[in-house]
Amino acid sequence: MPRPIQAVIHGPALVNNLQVVRRHAADSRVWAVIKANAYGHGIERAYEGLRQADGFGLLDLDEAVRLRQLGWQGPILLLEGFFKPEDLALVEQYRLTTTVHCEEQLRMLELARLKGPVSIQLKINTGMSRLGFAPAAYRAAWEHARAISGIGTIVHMTHFSDADGPRGIDHQLAAFEQATQGLPGEASLSNSAATLWHPRAHRDWVRPGVILYGASPTGVAADIEGTGLMPAMTLKSELIAVQDLQPGATVGYGSRFEAEQPMRIGIVACGYADGYPRHAPGWDGNYTPVLVDGVRTRMVGRVSMDMITVDLAEVPGARVGAPVTLWGQGLPIDEVAHAAGTVGYELMCALAPRVPVTVEPAGAADAGETLGKAA
């Protein structure tokens, strides 16, 4: 028998979360962002739950080819664009929309011998300072793009840096509107946070990512309560041993946790080699939440490669084989990530290849077929 750990991808949750996005941005089309192997969920698995999107946004050509091989005939957006002139042959072959964020890409398009026009999203750097033309240079970039015969539709695009925080989007939205004033074309601005909380930025296309997978853009689980979003991944395992400790007994590498009174602990088949955060705390008043038999308890001691240890004070009847939820249904991934000093995005993407993945089909209420290992 394999180790009892597994990840479950909840297809119905993906369907639900896309519907939540549509309720928030009813007048916009939706790019469902599936970069980073669909945030660790697997492109092939996520596709089934998100196929009612208007288009898919992803990062590289390999992901785009995989999506076409699944049968998707709609729009696909390369969020970072292309990198080399030879990439344009695949952009054309697979009918991809590409982000264009620099003069070098415009020159490559100008020199390319394309059979037909390529749709682009021309990116403005309104404050993120990663990719995009400066607002003062944007109009010239747009004029350059419009003059290139190999370019068809041009959509105005930017990315918000503070849509999930107190600074908000006003400064970037003002820069975007000034840079695009009087220019024809659709617009795509909103990431997950702006999709939820800034309706005036929805425009023609929204680009939700992490909310499609049921996590919060802020990293705070409470911030998405009441939205209807559901976790699309549950990482679960079982107790594989139980230990009774006396006062003074220590737990794990470095003996960071010491029992102050008689206590029972459970050993869970899950460790950092499975993608659980090694830096998740379990000592000195800082503890990471875990569910055992559906009851909330805490991790104690350090995370090791293959195991963690949990306090069974709240579940005294737990025995070997008791179910354990590391994150997902019943325990928001953002709570675990917050305890570990990171964000839910990272935990999703860090799911290790050795963890078996089971898929709950998008049209079913019960857990479904196993599609192998996490890619």
Swiss-Prot record:
Q: What biological-process GO terms show up in the record?
A: D-alanine biosynthetic process
Q: Gene3D superfamilies under this entry?
A: Alanine racemase (3.20.20.10), Lyase, Ornithine Decarboxylase, Chain A, domain 1 (2.40.37.10)
Tagged with keyword Signal: no
- Report keywords, A-Z: Isomerase, Pyridoxal phosphate
Identify the catalytic residues.
Answer: K35, Y253
What positions belong to coiled-coil segments? Answer: none
| GO MF entries | alanine racemase activity; pyridoxal phosphate binding
Q: In which pathway does it act?
A: Amino-acid biosynthesis; D-alanine biosynthesis; D-alanine from L-alanine: step 1/1
* Protein residues bound to substrate: R130, M305
Q: Reaction(s) catalyzed by this protein?
A: L-alanine = D-alanine
Sorted alphabetically, the Gene Ontology cellular component annotations on this record are: cytosol
Q: Which cofactors are reported in the record for this sequence?
A: pyridoxal 5'-phosphate
The record's annotation in InterPro entries points to:
Ala_racemase, Ala_racemase/Decarboxylase_C, Ala_racemase_C, Ala_racemase_N, Ala_racemase_pyridoxalP-BS, PLP-binding_barrel
- Give the Enzyme Commission number: 5.1.1.1
PTM sites of type N6-(pyridoxal phosphate)lysine: K35
The record, for CDD domains, names: PLPDE_III_AR_proteobact
Say yes or no: keyword Isomerase present: yes
Q: What does this protein do?
A: Catalyzes the interconversion of L-alanine and D-alanine. May also act on other amino acids.
Q: Which family does it belong to?
A: Belongs to the alanine racemase family.
What this protein is called in its record is Alanine racemase
Native organism is Ralstonia nicotianae (strain ATCC BAA-1114 / GMI1000) (Ralstonia solanacearum)
